[in-house]
C-alpha cells in the first residue's frame, strides 16, 4: 500500500516488475548517496514519473524489500528545502533543518 496517495501510480507500476535477487545478500553495503524529498508543493510535470514523496518510510521500505544488507546510508541533498527567508547565504541551511526533522521522525519510531 502506498504511503502517500500521490505515489499510487508509480508504486503500482513498480509492483508489476519482476524483482531481481540480490547477488550477495549477506554483503554489508553502505549506500553512498540517497535523497529525501516531498515534491507535492510543486506542479507535477507531465514528463516526470516519480514518487512525489520519498521520506523515511519509503527509503526504509526500499531497503527492506531489496534483499541487500544495507547497513548505512549517506544522505545527500542539493537545492531543496531552502529556508524561505533570512540572509541569502544562510537559506541553504534549510536542507540541514529538514534532515534533522526527518531524523527526529525516525527516532520517534512512528515513521
For each predicted feature, which ranges?
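Helix-coil boundary/capping segments in enzymes
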Residues: 1-111
Amino acid at each position: 500500500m502506498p504511503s502517500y496517495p500521490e505515489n499510487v501510480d508509480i508504486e503500482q507500476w513498480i509492483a508489476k516488475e519482476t524483482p531481481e535477487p540480490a547477488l550477495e545478500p549477506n554483503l554489508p553495503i553502505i549506500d553512498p548517496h540517497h535523497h529525501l524529498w516531498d515534491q507535492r508543493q510543486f506542479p507535477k510535470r507531465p514528463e516526470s514519473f516519480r514518487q512525489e514523496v520519498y521520506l523515511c518510510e519509503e527509503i526504509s521500505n526500499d531497503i527492506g524489500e531489496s534483499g541487500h544488507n544495507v547497513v548505512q546510508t549517506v544522505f545527500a541533498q542539493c537545492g531543496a528545502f531552502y529556508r524561505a527567508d533570512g540572509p541569502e547565504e544562510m537559506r541553504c541551511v534549510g536542507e540541514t533543518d529538514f534532515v534533522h526533522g526527518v531524523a527526529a521522525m525516525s527516532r520517534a519510531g512512528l515513521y
